[in-house]
Amino acid sequence: MIDIQGIKEALPHRYPMLLVDRVLEVSEDTIVAIKNVTINEPFFNGHFPQYPVMPGVVIMEALAQTAGVLELSKPENKGKLVFYAGMDKVKFKKQVVPGDQLVMTATFVKRRGTIAVVEAKAEVDGKLAASGTLTFAIGN
């Protein structure tokens, strides 16, 4: 398990863009983390005030950060950054609303040099909310 301090050591993101609250499981190529979604998230001010829904792109960013924690926690990547290089097969299946706990899983399926490909999914109460294939570039 990695707490918020460990997450902040791995990721350069800070409020309001730090979207990983805790890491529950870590293995060589897979990580499981959570994001507790509250009404205080800044994006709810405009998306949508009368019916707050977490934007899909923010869910994908949370998944990317989850993968980033795993990759940037490795000694050889300390101090580096992870940049989006692409997203494929992204699907949104369930709305994420205040009070939900997003359980995010990212599994690295391919690495070549500084490029990595991740299969990622986000679930709420065991139900798929979003999924996709994310491609990253690791840089200084």
Swiss-Prot record:
Record CDD domains: FabZ
Principal location: cytoplasm
Gene Ontology cellular component list: cytoplasm; membrane
PANTHER family, A to Z: 3-HYDROXYACYL-[ACYL-CARRIER-PROTEIN] DEHYDRATASE
Active site residues according to the UniProt entry: 47
EC numbers on record: 4.2.1.59
Classification via SUPFAM superfamilies: Thioesterase/thiol ester dehydrase-isomerase
Protein name (record): 3-hydroxyacyl-[acyl-carrier-protein] dehydratase FabZ
Species in which this protein is naturally found: Streptococcus pneumoniae serotype 4 (strain ATCC BAA-334 / TIGR4)
Catalytic activity: a (3R)-hydroxyacyl-[ACP] = a (2E)-enoyl-[ACP] + H2O
GO molecular function, one term: (3R)-hydroxyacyl-[acyl-carrier-protein] dehydratase activity
Keywords for the protein's UniProt record, in alphabetical order: Cytoplasm, Lipid A biosynthesis, Lipid biosynthesis, Lipid metabolism, Lyase
Localization: Cytoplasm
